[in-house]
Amino acid sequence: MLSSQTSSIFTVSRLNQTVRLLLEQEMGQVWISGEISNFTQPASGHWYFTLKDDTAQVRCAMFRNSNRRVTFRPQHGQQVLVRANITLYEPRGDYQIIVESMQPAGEGLLQQKYEQLKAKLQAEGLFDQQYKHPLPSPAYCVGVITSKTGAALHDILHVLKRRDPSLPVIIYPAAVQGEDAPGQIVRAITLANARKECDVLIVGRGGGSLEDLWSFNDERVARAIFASTIPVVSAVGHETDVTIADFVADLRAPTPSAAAEVVSRNQQELLRQMQTACQRLEMAMDYYLANRQRRFSQLYHRLQQQHPQLRLARQQTTLERLRQRMHLALENQLKQANQRQQRASQRLRQQNPQPRIHRAQSRIQQLEYRLAENFRARLSEQRERFGNTVTHLEAVSPLATLARGYSVSTATDGNVLKKVKQLKVGDMMTTRLKDGWVTSEVTAIKPVKKIRLG
């Protein structure tokens, strides 16, 4: 029974390999949605995390060459959509998925696109305060770009009628939700700028979800608002809703009604302000006239008390006194300047630089002579040391030994021959003499018997 089943017995390694091949070949690439947990990024740059839902979880790996294409930083608890290959890690038998691409799931993807476009336009300078147009004060004609059936238009018209019934309003209807909405909003802004009928534009709609307000996060709408020569007030959703259009517009209003408040004048308030201003002007004129009358009386009284001839005499005395003081001051300054000049001339005569120059020249000549003497002494010393070194090297040179009749023999492998047992009959050897080399063949070997002393 056991021998009949031997062909079906798997080793652990073979089993894991077979399962891995089945998973990779049968499943291929799949799309998986889930929540990220246990996210880590070691020094290798790879991502390791768990993808889970309410009832299950699976280990995931995303290698560096794949995760570098991801445009956001995965966070714990974030819902994502991944494209991955299913495999099995053979050494441990762990089932896992290898992620090739990742993107936020659902509204998270819209938020990611929102942040990317916001960063792009901000880098281009579309949000800079220097490009904002001031709103006209007062506005003589208001343009409204919104849906003609929406509640936002009703709120805007209601506020404008209450605050300034005489203010002209031109409506440029446009869809504010759906695929066609961005194009219609752009065309309405372009049309308003071409007609030049109004001096301020309100662009907006009522509240809604991120998807509902997405038309105002469209890049085309943002660039159209930025290019508008007519000041634009954005009024999208509620106060907590912030769109790309709000950053590009010249002014952001929290609601459509607030936008209408910003661009209009309150006629009742203007009338009250005019009445108050008239009263303040009358009081100011009365005070000014009374003050001028009092000042005139004071000046007239002083003029009667101070005769012009008396004032001229006092001024003449003061002028003469000032003239004398100025004359004395000039004389003192000239005297002091002359004294300073004399002292400077005396110091200059005492500090003649010529003797110092002569002393410096003598010092230089002495130093040059000492330098030359030191150089000659050092040169003689070095020559003597060099001669001694040459004599010493010649005394210990092996060539001198060879000159006295000695020789050095080497085998064919280059080793120096010191004993006869390094050779055998028929070997070749090379002998170094004083004036050259001799190559010879060994024909006989005769060892020398050692002489024992004692």
Curated annotation (Swiss-Prot):
It is an enzyme of class 3 (hydrolase). GO terms for molecular function: exodeoxyribonuclease VII activity; nucleic acid binding. It is found in: Cytoplasm. CDD domains: ExoVII_LU_OBF (cd04489). The keyword Hydrolase applies. Keywords: Cytoplasm, Exonuclease, Hydrolase, Nuclease. InterPro entries: Exonuc_VII_L (IPR003753), Exonuc_VII_lsu_C (IPR020579), OB-fold_nuc-bd_dom (IPR025824). It catalyses: Exonucleolytic cleavage in either 5'- to 3'- or 3'- to 5'-direction to yield nucleoside 5'-phosphates. It holds the Pfam family Exonuc_VII_L. The keyword Cell membrane does not apply. One of its GO terms (biological process) is DNA catabolic process. Residues 337-359 are annotated as: Disordered. Transmembrane segments: none annotated. Its EC number is 3.1.11.6. Residues 337-352 have a biased composition (Low complexity). GO terms for cellular component: cytoplasm; exodeoxyribonuclease VII complex. Bidirectionally degrades single-stranded DNA into large acid-insoluble oligonucleotides, which are then degraded further into small acid-soluble oligonucleotides. NCBIfam families: xseA. Belongs to the XseA family. This is Exodeoxyribonuclease 7 large subunit. It comes from Salmonella arizonae (strain ATCC BAA-731 / CDC346-86 / RSK2980).
